[in-house]
Regions:
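Active-site-adjacent "subsite" loops/lids of carbohydrate-active enzymes
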Residues: 18, 29, 34-104, 108
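Conserved, mostly hydrophobic/aromatic
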Residues: 20, 98, 105, 114, ...
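Active-site-proximal loop/short-helix segments
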Residues: 36-45, 91, 108-157
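Substrate-binding cleft of secreted/luminal carbohydrate-active enzymes
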Residues: 206-210, 214-233, 237-322
Length: 322
């Protein structure tokens, strides 16, 4: 497979933007920040704990950076377990790694913007507040609140908010880096005020992003527990517990239209600088539901999976392999 890839005579970074522009469309570079991959676990573990049986049980991938610097992956309070593939944004080195990589990719093609997906394919946390105890976080929390999260009881919500601040800091730094290039910035998240499964209760301070125009488009309703292409359930044996909001079982979540009206509309309408889109890759097509969403005054548009549209055969058999 690798040899075939190396023999491809065209560059998708060049071709895709050109095709999009010829059709009057904009081309965004799609990247992720919580999906650096994980090592291949022992076979005994893989027999009962895996991403999905079709293609990700006895195979894995991992970025060179996360493999070279394992301590940058988020860690639990006892410094015993890491959530592989989820790098800690409290480290300036991690933020710099993403910034340089994204800018390098953007320079390789005629893109109109950058889309950051907050989905993760890493093994879910066993409980929502399991990870987020790397040394810089401990130091910042101690400096800010006078409490050592390694040794003392601490306020969970202020800790969750601190984790969210690192995400906002990264978006601010990224926004500043994109300004000279005149590129737009979009983010895709779960609905609600936390990052959610499979990551944790990290505060998702999207209101601040909108108010200060750190982003141009906000895509909500993303889902990490299900493949957006073939709809396999991912890590179905590891759902975790303790989430303040949970899109998997609907805990503390309003129906999407009500949620948009009660929570997103006041912020989006007031600021009038950010467009709101609703992800529909994980929903069956419904003209009625889609029409209702599109008629909502706050919703700019819907997001679909081109894979499901272009590949009826693999969708029907539930397997995209030839």
């Amino acid at each position: 497979m690798i040899s075939c890839i190396n023999n491809v005579a065209w560059d998708d970074f060049k071709v895709m933007p050109s095709l999009a522009h010829n059709l009057g469309l904009k081309a965004y570079l799609y990247v992720s920040i919580f999906d650096e991959g994980f090592p291949l676990f022992p076979k005994k573990i893989r027999e009962v704990s895996y991403h999905n049986k079709m293609h990700h049980q006895h195979f894995t991938r991992q970025s060179d950076f996360s493999r070279k610097y394992p301590d940058y992956n988020v860690v639990d309070r006892n410094n015993e377990h890491r959530q592989w593939g989820v790098l800690c944004l409290a480290y300036p080195e991690v933020r710099d790694y993403f910034l340089k990589r994204f800018l390098r990719f953007l320079n390789d093609g005629d893109f109109d913007g950058l889309f950051i997906c907050f989905r993760s394919q890493s093994r879910p946390a066993d409980f929502a507040d399991q990870y987020g105890f790397n040394k810089p976080i401990q130091q910042d929390y101690l400096a800010k609140y006078g409490c050592n999260i390694y040794e003392q009881d601490f306020n969970l919500q202020t800790w969750r908010d601190l984790l969210g601040e690192y995400l906002t800091t990264f978006l601010f730094e990224l926004r500043e880096s994109l300004k000279p290039l005149s590129l737009r910035l979009s983010v895709g998240t779960a609905r609600g005020d936390i990052v959610g499964p499979p990551l944790g209760n990290t505060t998702l301070n999207w209101r601040k992003w909108v108010k200060h125009r750190l982003i141009d488009e906000l895509v909500i309703n993303q889902n990490s527990s299900q493949c957006p292409s073939v709809w396999h359930q991912l890590w179905p044996m590891h759902r975790g517990y303790g989430y303040l909001q949970n899109y998997i079982d609907g805990y503390n979540m309003e129906p999407v239209l009500e949620h948009i009206s009660s929570t997103y509309t006041p912020i989006i309408i007031k600021n009038k600088t950010v467009d709101l889109f609703v992800a529909r890759q994980w929903n069956k097509r419904s003209k009625t539901e889609e029409a209702k969403l599109l008629s909502h005054p706050t919703v700019k548009g819907l997001v679909f999976s081109s894979f499901r549209h272009d590949n009826p055969g693999p969708i029907a058999r539930g397997d995209w392999r030839v």
